[in-house]
């Protein structure tokens, strides 16, 4: 039996940790985004529980909450978005912004890179989805048939044979877009509350969505249909598929739920102990999740400004 064990924490942000990005190019580096308006490049040392790594570089420039961050496939560049209405492209070696993307009229909530890193998609509280090139030029704004409320999350499919974008929003909808013509391919109905997260499986065949209603809904991207629903039991703030196991992870309130998708059963439920004796102290919520490229380590960002690091271990049963 496989389970998850808490290995350590990363302390450095002064605000909620809104997103975490990892890269196969450098397993000792992760990047995190925060409501403290910064991004931190972490050097992982894996020393012990209290010192799993240290902040190597702090990237500053956004003047409001940083809501999302992604790494380029070579691990050299990062792309972030913020409630300051902009996106930024960062050269990580130099720790500087090389390009600012201006065009959204309200907070930008989500950003993603296409598989070849040539296209960028962003979603905003202005209810639009924008496609950009790496030079910071907006090539297309999806408005026809777009979300009628905030666009909370946008993701590209990693499958280059089926070039699509998946988005979700506060209108309870999951939408699948044809990347070739930016036209709507499928509307997925079923959620009963606003959506926070959508994620595409590593092979591009499935996507999962979640939000206020606490359900993780799985959709077949090839057939364009609903497959099944998993009960998260609390508001879902983040979702991610394991890169090498048939697992889906959901950040649901203070917990992280991990499902085996073949069995549709819970592999593990991760909850950090509440520190503090006061009965009022509520456990922090988990709001971001990222797997290491090898699928052995799960990084989780919380509203107590910490990143907690969990590792896959084998139990003796």
From Swiss-Prot:
PROSITE patterns for this protein: WD_REPEATS_1, WD_REPEATS_2, WD_REPEATS_REGION
Name used for this protein in its record: Small ribosomal subunit protein RACK1
WD repeat residue intervals: 3-45, 52-93, 94-135, 137-180, 181-221, 222-262, 263-313
Keyword Signal: no
One of the Pfam families matching this protein, by short name: WD40
GO molecular function: ribosome binding; translation regulator activity
CC annotations in GO: ribonucleoprotein complex; ribosome
